[in-house]
Amino acid sequence: MSNRVIIFDTTLRDGEQALAASLSVKEKLQIAMALERLGVDVMEVGFPVSSPGDFESVQTIARTIKNSRVCALSRALEKDIDAAAQALSVAEQFRIHTFISTSTIHVESKLKRSFEQVLEMAVGAVKYARRFTDDVEFSCEDAGRTPIDNLCRMVEAAIHAGARTINIPDTVGYTVPSEFGGIIQTLFNRVPNIDQAIISVHCHDDLGMSVANSITAVQHGARQIECTMNGIGERAGNCSLEEIAMILATRKNLLGVETGINAKEIHRTSNLVSQLCNMPIQSNKAIVGANAFTHSSGIHQDGMLKAQNTYEIMTPESIGLNRNNLNMTSRSGRHVIKHRMEEMGYSEQDFNLDALYEQFLHLADKKGQVFDYDLEALAFMEAQAAEDNFYQLQQLVVQSDSTEGVATATVRIDVGGEIKTEAATGNGPVDAAYNAIARATDRRIDIISYKLGAKGEGQNALGQVDITAVYHEQNFHGVGLATDVVEASARALVHVMNLTCRADKVADYKQNMHKNRELGGV
């Protein structure tokens, strides 16, 4: 048996079914090209018979993708197969994926047919699809709840009809690993022509078992896993591609199989899918979550500084990240503070570690996470100055033209004791507020992340805006709270402006410090 596991991505078909709004053809093509760079073997990109838009997107992707095999879904109906074949005909290599329900509840309640009739439809669909390509995949929908005798008969008949891949879906995420592995094992034991097809699995996450079930299936002989980027999909989602890829890579010593995935593209592809699908990734998501390579415990941080593999079983670089994060919080020890200062280029004679650590703990207790620029400010500025706000937003007035989409914002800001009033227009109220604040502070920043949330519940909830901005090639993080979203955005912007102002003062101090050294001063 081959030790190569085929990665069948269905982000653009099953994954898209979870979205509140459909992706455009251009967005689907962007994702398809990213999946090709990632190295997926097969990408299922739509259901052509379902709509003209889906047909167009499948055809566009089929015409563009060269290295991955492009696949389209069809029911066990000739009109579906015709549409799939027509949309895929421009591809260099393609697959038709046809399916029918096989569980008793689906056969009787949904299809309202006998199992024998369904078996006949399945065989007919596979034979018809083979007229267009020799790469036909057949799926037994709801295989996880299908009586095993019926499942064995269906699989044998589909292979005999010409299916090269047989997919065994846990459509409703019902099975547990021991049970699902037993199904795969039984198929290998009882289906006489099983060696003439690749066994595939397609697991859903309703009980949180999709990845575990897929791995168990591989251990029992499955050699294709159907999955989606970030695990998006119907209901609770699908088996997560990034988790599967990294499990098989990290535990190759146990599982003895490999994929063709270029793992260094995982982070970039995950972010693209998250942004285009408007589905944020939870921070604690395995592999691609913001906290996946972040360490906050002082004990863990100490271990990481001594040997990275004490608390990391894979490296952030392996998925395309630059490095891990040692979050500086009140749980961090002196060694972490010393390490961060040294990484920023300071020697021990530049700062008093004991005094700095005491100030750090005071700030961390108030603020939570402390960033590098906070640490520098504590080291080189008086504590009071490090926390002062040079810019203070006193008033914000916004007017919007609903017909033109242009907004005007007027701000009154205290700039180091001097009151400044500025007005500006923008593409919407937040953009206008930013332009007005930039005028008043005479500072320009590039916003690279904008997140809107809420603090509190019901009518008492406050809008919370978190932004990340770049200033002089350094990232700064601002937070704003207000009952109004635009005001919260403005406060977050002013917060960042204050941080950049403080950073400039620290830079001046450092420059003077270096000059004094060169002159032989203290």
From Swiss-Prot:
Compartmental location: Cytoplasm
- EC number assigned by the record: 2.3.3.13
Q: Name one Pfam family in it.
A: LeuA_dimer
Q: Please give the SMART domains that the UniProt record associates with this protein.
A: LeuA_dimer
Name the UniProt key words of this record, in alphabetical order. Answer: Amino-acid biosynthesis, Branched-chain amino acid biosynthesis, Cytoplasm, Leucine biosynthesis, Manganese, Metal-binding, Transferase
Where is this protein chiefly located?
cytoplasm
What pathway annotation does it carry? Amino-acid biosynthesis; L-leucine biosynthesis; L-leucine from 3-methyl-2-oxobutanoate: step 1/4
* Reactions it catalyzes: 3-methyl-2-oxobutanoate + acetyl-CoA + H2O = (2S)-2-isopropylmalate + CoA + H(+)
Show where the Pyruvate carboxyltransferase domain sits.
Answer: 5-267
One of its GO biological process terms is: L-leucine biosynthetic process
Concerning its family, UniProt says: Belongs to the alpha-IPM synthase/homocitrate synthase family. LeuA type 1 subfamily.
Quote the protein name from its UniProt record.
Answer: 2-isopropylmalate synthase
Q: Which InterPro entries match?
A: 2-IPM_HCS-like, 2-isopropylmalate_synth_dimer, AIPM/Hcit_synth_CS, Aldolase_TIM, LeuA/HCS_post-cat, LeuA_allosteric_dom_sf, LeuA_bact_synth, PYR_CT
Q: Report the source organism.
A: Shewanella sp. (strain ANA-3)
Q: Which GO terms describe its cellular component?
A: cytosol
